[in-house]
Amino acid sequence: NMILLGIDAPNILHTNTLSESLADIQEKDRYDIVLANPPFGGKERKEVQLNFPIRSGETAFLFLQHFIKMLRAGGRGGIVIKNTFLSNTDNASVSLRKLLLESCQLHTVLDCPSGTFQGAGVKTVVLFFEKGAPTRKVWFYQLDPGRNLGKMNPLNDDDLAEFVKLQKTFADSPKSWTVDAKTFDPATFDLSVKNPNGGEEVTHRRPQAIMDEIAALDVENAEVLKRIRKLL
């Protein structure tokens, strides 16, 4: 992408963020805001996992720990992660939810529809939190654009307009509701709360639509590679 955009001298370090021990992060290294869509589904080596108090081969879980550590007190985070993080019962998931709820005010969970991130193949949520005080209440919003998302029909600003409006006051609606953190199971810290304001409807994409999307992505990737080869 940088070649195609004409960026000849990028100020980018080729390194593995996760190879940095959390114990080495000092106050001068911290930030006020972290916005990220970390890679999920990947696996990290055992020696890299040793850098984290909550060890997991899942890269997204390691990144989330890194982001929390990198925030200053009062710092804010907005992190994309697989929706299974909300309910998985493995030790790492439970411990990480506990860490998040006890060290940060997780004020918003945005439940994204299938197809939000093309090619990801999984449903995602966005966690919005502020580091410092523990979580008191969590506001949930189920994003429903009313259509199947795809490469030619992506999520847009209009789809997020209601979320942005309601989130300012954490208002209840047919798509949003608030949960007191005291009601979370203290053994699992399960965050997969059902919408109390209406039946939860699961929309499955047609197999043909999925196949068409895969074919379109293959064509696009082939075209990009062709252009890169011409530049080499």
Where are these regions (language model features)?
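Short, conserved SAM-binding/catalytic segment
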Residues: N1-A9
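A conserved structural/catalytic subdomain of Rossmann-like adenosyl-cofactor enzymes
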Residues: H14, S19-L232
